[in-house]
C-alpha cells in the first residue's frame, strides 16, 4: 500500500464529496480527544449548507458510503456532525511495511520541480561564531534538510561581508595585536574588536613577516599604508573564514556556495543595478541624492541608494547581491535567515528587488531571535576567552553538538529563547534530547536482545497489533509525510521536534507497559519487533532533518 492511512481516509472522503457534488476539501485530525487511532473529519459540518442538509443527516450519508469501503472497524458520528473513524488494525499495520520498504526515503514528498536558495549564518569574518550564529545555523540547516525532504531542490548560500568598514576595523584590530605582540606600545582604538583570537593571528603574521610593519601608523579604521592595509584585511578574512567553515562543519552545517560582497564591487554589479533602476524609471534624484521608489511596492518611504556625497547606502550592495543571486541560481524562492534586528529591512529589500523586475514575493525572510544562556538560574557569561560574546566552540564543549542543535531547533525561531545549560546536560526524561535519543537506544536494545535470542522481526498485514498504544503510534508514524509538509510550509523546525517528542512519549510508555519479547508468543513478538524497527526508522529520519545522531546505547 503506497498511500498513507490518512491519504486513504482523505481519498475515501473526497470520493464521497464528488458523489454528493461537494466542493469543500476534507480536513482530517488524528488521535482526536486523546483517542488512540481515531481519525476525525469536519467535512459534514463545513459542507452541509452547500447540499442543503443538516450536518448530522449528511454525516449519516457519509457513514453509509464509508462502510462500503471496508476500511474501517468503527465509524461514529458525534455532535454537531463530526465523523470519527477507526481504521482496521490489519490495514493500519501496513504502515510498518511502508516504513521499512522506503527506509530513509520514508516521509519524502513528491518532487516539486522548484529551487529554493537558503542563505544563512553569513556572519562577518571578524571573529569566531557565537551562540546567536549557532541558532541561525541550526534553523537554516534544518530548513535545508526539511525542504529537501519535502521534494525541493535546495541550494545553500553564505554571504561573506568582506567589504565595508567592519573589515577595515578588523585589519586595524589585527594590526594593533601584531604590534603589541612585538612589544610595541600600541593603543587599540575603541571601535576595535576584543578577544584573544586576534593574538593568535598576530603570532602567525609575525612568524611569516617578522617586524617589517612595525613602523607603520594607523587610525581607527585604516593602516596608513595601502598595501599593508590590504594585506592585513585579506589575511584576516582568510583566517577567520577558515575557522568559521571548520566551526560550521563541526556543528554539522554544510554550506556549498560562499558569495563575496567584495566581488559585487569588483565586478561592477552595483553600477549595473543603478543603470537598471534608471532604465526602469525606478529611481529619481532629490537634494543631490538618488532615491529608489520603494513606496510603489508597499515600503513606508522611498529609500536612498546614493547619498549626496556619492557614497552608497547599505541597501544598494545588498540589492545588487540578491539580484545577482536570482540570476545565478535561477531559484524560485530566496530564503534569508536573518537576526530579529533586521525586521525593518525586509519590506525595502522586497520592494527594491521588485523594482528590478523580480517577483515581489521571491525574497522571504526567516527571522531568528536572540538566544540567552541560563545556568544555575541566571544568565551565563563565559570568561574563558576575553570578549563580550559567548562562543559556539565553548558551548559545544559543555553540551555537545546533538544537544545544542536539538534544543535550538525545538523552539520557534521567531521568539526569544532561554537555553538552560543545566537542563540539556541532565540524563533523565526532563531533558528533551536525552528523552529522544534514549528512545532510539531502547529500540536498538530490544532488537539486539531479539537477535541474541535468534528471533527475527516479522512484517506482514495483521490484526494482532491492536494495543491502543500500538494503534496510536502506527497512526503517528503514518502521519510523518503530513508533518513534513506542514513543517516545510510553516518553515517550522519546532514541529519536527514536537513530532519526535510525541513518538518518544508514547513509545516509552509502551515499553514500560508491554512485554515486547515474549517467547511464549513468538508470532506477536516477531510482529512487534517489526513495529520497533519501524519506530526506529522514523525516528532516524526525523533526527536526520534536525541534524543529530540516533544513539545505539546509553
Curated annotation (Swiss-Prot):
SUPFAM superfamilies in the cross-refs: Anticodon-binding domain of a subclass of class I aminoacyl-tRNA synthetases, Arginyl-tRNA synthetase (ArgRS), N-terminal 'additional' domain, Nucleotidylyl transferase
Record the organism.
Mycoplasma capricolum subsp. capricolum (strain California kid / ATCC 27343 / NCTC 10154)
Q: What high-level taxonomic lineage is stated for the organism?
A: Bacteria, Bacillati, Mycoplasmatota, Mollicutes, Mycoplasmataceae
The family database entries (CDD domains) matched by this protein are listed as: ArgRS_core
Chief subcellular location equals: cytoplasm
Q: Which GO terms describe its biological process?
A: arginyl-tRNA aminoacylation
Respond yes or no to whether keyword Aminoacyl-tRNA synthetase is given for this record: yes
* Name of the encoding gene: argS
Provide GO CC annotations from the record: cytoplasm
Instruction: Quote the protein name from its UniProt record.
Output: Arginine--tRNA ligase
